[in-house]
């Protein structure tokens, strides 16, 4: 069983790049397709707490439910925002990665390098060609 978990959306380039960087470290993570299998309320609350971010910081703003529900307004409590994310998982920003070294919202994708327990096994470039890791497994930025 893997000690790394990624809350993943395969339609998202950032999420795909993050998953491939995990694999480039020699690890095969547990992949949770959170749109089909959203976290429970308790899991989501724990993820937010472990990341040390606000509930609002996890909200995706460029999706239809955000505007339809008027979530740009500050009138909603954290509990209400969590309810909206559970009802509309597309509102949960991604990818979220959990490792023994921490939990992070990996935006940009190279944030994952800060919490991987194993070094990169070789060069890595994002889908757009941007080089992130050199041949020796060293981070370029």
Curated annotation (Swiss-Prot):
The active site is at residue 12. Its EC number is 1.20.4.1. Keywords: Arsenical resistance, Oxidoreductase, Plasmid. It comes from the Bacteria. One of its GO terms (biological process) is response to arsenic-containing substance. GO terms for molecular function: arsenate reductase (glutaredoxin) activity. It is an enzyme of class 1 (oxidoreductase). It catalyses: [glutaredoxin]-dithiol + arsenate + glutathione + H(+) = glutathionyl-S-S-[glutaredoxin] + arsenite + H2O. PROSITE patterns: ARSC. The keyword Oxidoreductase applies. SUPFAM superfamilies: Thioredoxin-like (SSF52833). The record marks 8, 60, 94, 107 as: Important for activity. NCBIfam families: arsC, PRK10026.1. Belongs to the ArsC family. Involved in resistance to arsenate. Catalyzes the reduction of arsenate [As(V)] to arsenite [As(III)]. This is Arsenate reductase. The gene is arsC.
